[in-house]
């Protein structure tokens, strides 16, 4: 006599196959793939196996995505619910202008991992800050999901968390990539520090720092090394929020090999140890001095900028007249004092106007005290270059825009919620790659030589273009002749079709 089922008939009639078993979980009828297993005793039993869907009484069987895929692969049933319209223009543009970056990643990482890193960075560069649990949505709805559909990597939360953890804990490929950037750079390297607010109480690096009163939260400190002439980042490294830059930079410099490099750093990095590190292996440095420096105090007493003068070009048409005083401290170290005459005159005029208007704290006494020192720079250097070159190198450092500074919103790269130590360092590398992509886009925009066109404008215009799925292929939609002409001037011509 057959055993009578305890499940209602309005449920059992929707049983999808013989090898399925239905389980009532508090009124939810889940369906599992049933299989027979032979026990060690020789007797037979059953195994529920994996979940394939659920049954709603009176409605039918609802397969989950795994079972849908299984049925489709067996040509038993098709569930055509895939995305048929993807964002094309922004991603295709960046893919075209960053081919060399993709090749560099492939030289240091396995192909799957290189592609995953590349896609993650592209998504961040195109869309600004995207939380890790939202990246996959952007990926699936982008042209990247077509380009890399034959790859097996995933872009979900777990997959990207594992990626960041591996980048932070298995650092040899990262070291190789960064060292290649350093070896092939212009040898003019700036190092700068950034304070990043950290909202995670479990982050090992997050600590109260010198900006606690401003941030109202712990911070982490990020040091970034840049190639000044090529305007790309070379290294990102996160340090404890309580650490000072002059100590953190010791670790940064020791972690990679720098040879015949000229360092441009700010006064916060001034220490004997750091200066020695920046002077070995044929390296040299340029660093501004603080007003409390003993040599600055001594030189100020009798300063006369009589060593020479030159004209510094500040822009396409703008220039500045610079006079300077130069003094050799020892066999290697010089102090050069520069005075920007035009800047000094401009600030004198501005101050006098504010003083005439009766603004608070703008007094004749303060004017007489400070007017001679406006536009004056005290630089210490071990570079053998002449004074005009040293000044030009130092001023060039100020034109660097980091990707951290480019993104402007409240929940962004300046307000991280990362908890894991390794994930934090893995994200450093993603930010490095994103910063390189950003600068390549910036250079491509500059080449069209239109001051009215910005990166934002280009991404908006390219972002209108879509790839839509048709019966025979994917086809380009939503284009405009004016936008196509602008993008062509950048060297990007969109594909009209893409294979299925």
Predicted stretch roles:
Residues 218, 238, 282-399, 464-476, ...:
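An anionic, glycine-rich sequence signature occurring as long contiguous blocks
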Residues 33, 135, 188-196, 231, ...:
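Short, conserved catalytic/metal-binding motifs centered on acidic residues
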Residues 264-273, 291-294, 423:
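Acidic, metal-coordinating catalytic cores used for nucleic-acid/nucleotide bond scission
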Residues 237-258:
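Active-site beta-loop-alpha junctions of metal-dependent nucleic acid enzymes
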Residues 418-442:
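Basic, amphipathic alpha-helical segments enriched in Lys/Arg and hydrophobic/aromatic residues
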Residues 387-393, 411-424:
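Short, solvent-exposed helix-loop connector elements
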